Regions:
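Conserved helicase NTPase catalytic core signature
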Residues: 2-91
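Conserved helicase motor core of SF1/SF2 NTP-dependent helicases
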Residues: 3, 8-10, 14-15, 78-367
Length: 367
């Protein structure tokens, strides 16, 4: 791919050697300018002016030829405003990951195209807006979302998915995609262990784990739940077989919506010598860190456990959709059911797993 980048194509152009020589000459003249007399400086400046004019002339010539020949140009939305694309028009503009693109950024590129195709999933992560006031003002409402809401007839859903076991897929399909997703035959029944249950909820309620709020941040942590997750991971690796995990490079994703929980889990993994051979196969990250990725096994620590049913930004269901759909063959959710199931989404998810997977009390893993 590097050979097709703008920089590499530019450097491969027949006129680049002359341009490089001119740039070198400019640098040499500039470095020696202070040492020259007044008259010599004037001569040098005149030469610099001519060299710079010729360098600009060559740059424009190379750019024009490169982009005249190009059938496809790939760039960021903001990058489409680069001077090399000035006054250029394109038949079709594809905006990938459009659900994460700010509308204002989209319009930078849209003005250069006759038609636009937005590709993405507005049921997954939105753009990152650091200013709360801007988000409340609508900056986090993307162009893709607006089109989906106002012109649903223009939307096409890619219905066949090639990642997940069907039991993992069915719930997000039902909740987010009008039950329209289908599994490709080669992944429909994929699994690691024979007779294994693809979807499991490990209910922490009976263990009375407690969430904590860190003093220096808004983040939450549930240390006992993190310890249970790591213990459960070890048991599952042992169940599969250590050699098989290494031979087949079976990989594991440990996800939590809370950064503090992720950091605590990473520390537990790092300090436990059992995981040393498997560390390259284990990734612990927030939901945002897993966007666009997938793992054979996904374990999710939901953290929240309180008497009032407060779940904070677990209520952003787009993040949960991302977390759930990262798994290829095994999905394990660790969470306090009485706290979480006060929310309609988690109630239905819990009931789905009860009926189609397996709900296990934490007592079986801590005894």
């Amino acid at each position: 791919m590097l050979s097709f980048t703008y920089e590499r194509r530019f450097e491969s152009h027949p006129d680049y050697a002359e341009l490089w020589g001119i740039r070198k000459a400019i640098r040499e003249i500039q470095s020696n300018l202070r040492k020259k007399s007044h008259g010599e400086k004037e001569t040098a400046r005149n030469r610099l002016s001519r060299l710079r004019f010729r360098a600009t002339e060559l740059e424009v010539k190379i750019d024009t030829e490169l982009f005249d020949e190009a059938r496809v140009v790939a760039c960021t939305l903001v990058g489409s405003a680069n001077r090399v694309l000035t006054n250029r028009n394109f038949t079709t503009l594809f905006i990938d990951e459009a659900a994460q693109a700010l509308e204002a950024a989209c319009w930078i590129a849209i003005g250069k195209a006759d038609r636009v195709i937005l590709a993405g999933d507005h049921h997954q992560l939105p753009p990152t807006i650091k200013c709360i006031e801007a988000a409340r003002g609508g900056l986090d409402h993307t162009l893709m979302q607006k089109i989906t809401d106002r012109k649903p007839e223009t939307v096409s859903l890619l219905k066949t998915q090639y990642r997940m076991n069907e039991d993992i897929m069915r719930f997000p399909s039902r909740w987010f995609y009008h039950d329209e997703l289908q599994s490709a035959p080669e992944v429909k029944h994929r699994g690691i262990l024979e007779f294994d249950t693809p979807v499991v909820w490990l209910d922490t309620a009976d263990c009375h784990f407690e969430e904590d709020r860190l003093d220096d941040s808004m983040s939450r942590i549930n240390r006992d739940e993190a310890t249970l997750l790591v213990s459960t991971l070890q048991k599952y690796i042992e169940k599969i077989g250590k050699e098989r995990v290494l031979d087949e490079s079976i990989d594991f994703g440990l996800i939590s919506p809370y950064k503090s929980q992720v950091q605590y889990i990473r520390g537990l993994i790092k300090r436990d010598t059992f995981f040393k051979p498997f560390r390259r196969l284990i990734t612990a990250h927030t939901v945002d860190g897993f966007q666009g990725q997938e793992r054979d096994v996904i374990m999710i620590s939901l953290v929240r456990a309180n008497d009032k049913g407060r779940i904070g930004f677990l209520g952003d269901l787009r993040r949960m959709n991302v977390a759930i759909t990262r798994a290829r063959m095994k999905l394990m959710i660790l969470g306090d059911a009485p706290t979480l199931t006060r929310h309609a989404f988690y109630k239905e998810l819990y009931e789905y797993i009860w009926e189609n997977g397996q709900v296990i009390t934490c007592l079986l893993y801590t005894s």
